[in-house]
Amino acid sequence: MDGRTLGLWLLPPVVGGIIGYFTNDLAIRMLFRPYRPVVIGGWQLPFTPGLIPANQGRLARRIADAILGSLLTPDALHDLARRLLELPRLEAAIAWLVSLLLERLREVRDPRSIEVAADVLRDLAGSALPRWLRAIVRQRQGLDAQIDRWFEQQLLSQKLGPLQAQQLGDWLLEGAFPPDQIRRVMLDFLTDDNIRNLDRIVRDRTRGTDWVIANLFGVQSSLQRLRQFLREQPEAGDAVIAELSQRLALRQQLSQALQTFQLTDLPQTTLTDLRLQLRQGLRQWLDQDGLSLLEGALGGLDWTAAARALLDRLRTAVISDEAIAAFSHEVALILDQRLEHELEDLVAAALPILALEDLIIGRVEATPAADLEAAIQGIVRSELQAIVNIGGVLGVLLGCVQSLINVWSLST
């Protein structure tokens, strides 16, 4: 085999392999180069600058549309925000902020800083507490649950102490049911019909010697004389009732009864009605008078003294990491519950503020064409090397086919 025939066999595969292997690199270079327009004699050469530098603005918009349309969709951003705002991360962030705030507050000593802290407390309390109160009133189920829990855990198990029972007993006997009031109640009760009914009941239900006395004398005349006495001599009647109360030791007996009394002794229907009335009363009071009472209490506070006392307390108090962690956990739970319902709306509201499309377009347009070329070349060499190798193999195969065609044409 002479040199000419050997060249016909070897030259096409070698040339085809070289062309196929370096075609991708050449194509990428042709897309980017030249980076700037080439002007000769006031005339710009065609295809200068390269395809991508000449259309970098439009390319930036297409890249932004592709990223926001398929990669950074609102759902994807929502999932990303949800992962970023997981409960452990929220707890860690809140704990860090609390620790930093405590360190800064311990360094506050000058009067100007105290005044600033007082203004912050005033503004925070003036805006947050009324809003918190209105939110509590609006959340009827949550408020009812808190009232029921307090009613069952605190109110039902409460008992009066000896002093409290004595004071309440004194008020009942002297304020609610004084002798004069008891006398009036007795006069209202001792009507002619009630006296006759009492007399008949005594006659019917007595036995033995009591039956003889009841049927011979009865109680009608005695009750009528008692009514006449109470009506005609009110002061004497009041004195008799007061003396009778003292002789019967009603004050001591009432005090002992009040000490042993609990709300659980009442019927269940009564407790249910009491719970409902307590709910309604507290809710109505918070709705009508709670806000004005809160504003009045906040308006009368000395915020400067409160801020100074708070800072002194924070400066001297030892706050453990466990307390900060517990506080951070509770606050994180509240934020997590709110974010569960409002995160989608927050992400939707944040998208126009972030202006991701403008950011992507600006970054692509600001990137030099040489840097874009280097980035794409790096991706091709590291991630798409198989395509380069396939190009070389295809070039060799096509060269072999060309060699066969050349040899066949010579033989014919």
Swiss-Prot record:
What GO CC terms are in its UniProt record?
plasma membrane
Q: How does it sit in the membrane?
A: Multi-pass membrane protein
What keyword terms does UniProt attach to this protein? Cell inner membrane, Cell membrane, Membrane, Transmembrane, Transmembrane helix
A family per Pfam: DUF445
Tagged with keyword Membrane:
yes
PANTHER family, A to Z: UPF0754 MEMBRANE PROTEIN YHEB
Q: What is the protein's given name?
A: UPF0754 membrane protein Synpcc7942_1098
Q: Which organism is it from?
A: Synechococcus elongatus (strain ATCC 33912 / PCC 7942 / FACHB-805)
